[in-house]
UniProtKB/Swiss-Prot annotation:
It comes from Schizosaccharomyces pombe (strain 972 / ATCC 24843) (Fission yeast). Mitochondrial transporter that imports/exports pyrimidine nucleotides into and from mitochondria. Selectively transports uridine, thymidine, and cytosine (deoxy)nucleoside di- and triphosphates by an antiport mechanism. Also transports, with lower efficiency, uridine, thymidine, and cytosine (deoxy)nucleoside monophosphates as well as guanosine (deoxy)nucleoside di- and triphosphate. This is Mitochondrial carrier protein rim2. PANTHER family: MITOCHONDRIAL CARRIER PROTEIN RIM2. The keyword tRNA-binding does not apply. The gene is rim2. It is a multi-pass membrane protein. Gene3D superfamilies: Mitochondrial carrier domain (1.50.40.10).
Length: 347
């Protein structure tokens, strides 16, 4: 005869499976209009980009090789990871202060125009592709039921589509942010001027520099989506358990549920960004303007990885990580939080 301890794990496992199925069914029953993902993603992306624009400027500068002599050598001397992280944090604060003092407050938002022009369609495309893609893939391959494999495929497809569609915009944004104005005339007068000069000097292919690194970064967005869905499922199961037990939902429960989603978005981004960060550095280096003599220092993905490694070591591949995390983690919370709120009303 089986003991209670032998039965309970099986019963709990079965109950969890039932709750997961119910959560999936509930999600499918209230499937929002396809275009709602597009609208919610674009608005959420805009809000996140505006809120974290100054840190995006700092991150881009720390990733570039223009700032390596001043900041990176000091960080490279740090043997302790905690000391290196602290130096990265101080570098972030120093650059924020210097940009404001020497270039003005508006410089903290330099590149925001093309950033918004890139972010809004990028987020719209990504959320639209992922939101509708996972539903289509679930219908095709898993009888309408979502799981981690479905989320993985949908996120990867959405990442490739988004990267290919928006690479020229990100290239312009990067070059405008690295275009220093103190002590010399600006190389680019505007986003249009940057596009014209890039095509004239480097050809149409110049607008797609860094695309290989962007495609490499699809892994980051894919991992982020999969992790976020796990956190969302945990919240959904908690809600269903309350409902089955007849427990009335309180304001505290709602706050806890929304906090779980926001926290899940932040943790998912933190983990994904930490793992995949080197591709961000390489992508920024590949998108830099050519040197004064017109010869680009970085000519390809592998060559760029090797050169950064030889010149600066592993620290070079993680230049600007602190500024990056300070930006992308709150950005992810704002992005996914805004997306969920908007979808709640229009979905």
């Amino acid at each position: 005869m089986l003991s209670n301890s032998e039965i309970k794990p099986s019963e709990n496992s079965q109950k969890t499976k039932v709750l997961l199925t119910k959560a999936n069914n509930a999600s499918n029953e209230r499937a929002p209009p396809p275009l709602s993902h597009f609208i919610a993603g674009g608005v959420a992306g805009m809000l996140g980009a505006i809120a974290t624009a100054p840190l995006d400027v700092v991150k881009t500068r720390l990733q570039s090789d223009f700032y390596k002599d001043r900041f990176l050598k000091q960080t490279a001397k740090s043997k302790s990871p905690l000391t290196a992280a602290y130096r990265h944090f101080m570098d972030t604060c120093i650059i924020l202060k210097n940009v404001k003092v020497h270039e003005g407050t508006r410089a903290l938002f330099r590149g925001l125009g093309p950033n918004l022009i890139g972010t809004i369609p990028a987020r719209s495309i990504n959320f639209f592709s992922y939101g509708n893609g996972k539903r289509i893939l679930a219908d095709l391959f898993n009888n309408g039921q979502e799981n981690s494999q479905i989320h993985l495929m949908a996120a990867a497809i959405a990442g490739v589509i988004t990267s290919a569609a928006t690479n020229p915009i990100w290239l312009v944004k990067t070059r405008l942010q690295l275009d220093k104005k103190s002590g010399q005339a600006a190389q680019y007068r505007s986003s249009i001027d940057c596009i014209i000069k890039t095509i004239r000097l480097e050809g149409f292919r110049g607008l797609y520099k860094g695309l290989s690194a962007s495609l490499l970064g699809v892994g980051e967005s894919t991992l982020q989506w999969v992790l976020y869905e796990k956190f969302k499922h945990a919240v959904a199961i908690r809600q269903l358990r309350r409902k089955e037990l007849g427990i009335q939902e309180t304001i505290y429960d709602k706050v806890l549920d929304w906090g779980g989603k926001l926290g899940g978005a932040g943790i998912a981004k933190f983990m994904a960004a930490g793992i995949a960060y080197p591709h961000e550095v390489v992508r920024t280096r590949l998108r830099q303007s050519p040197s004064i003599n017109g010869t680009p220092k970085y000519t390809g993905l592998i060559q760029c990885f090797k050169l950064v490694w030889m010149e600066q070591g592993i620290v070079g591949l993680y230049g600007g990580l602190t500024a990056h995390l300070l930006r992308v983690v709150p950005n992810a919370c704002i992005l996914f939080g805004s997306y969920e709120v908007i979808m709640h009303f229009i979905g």
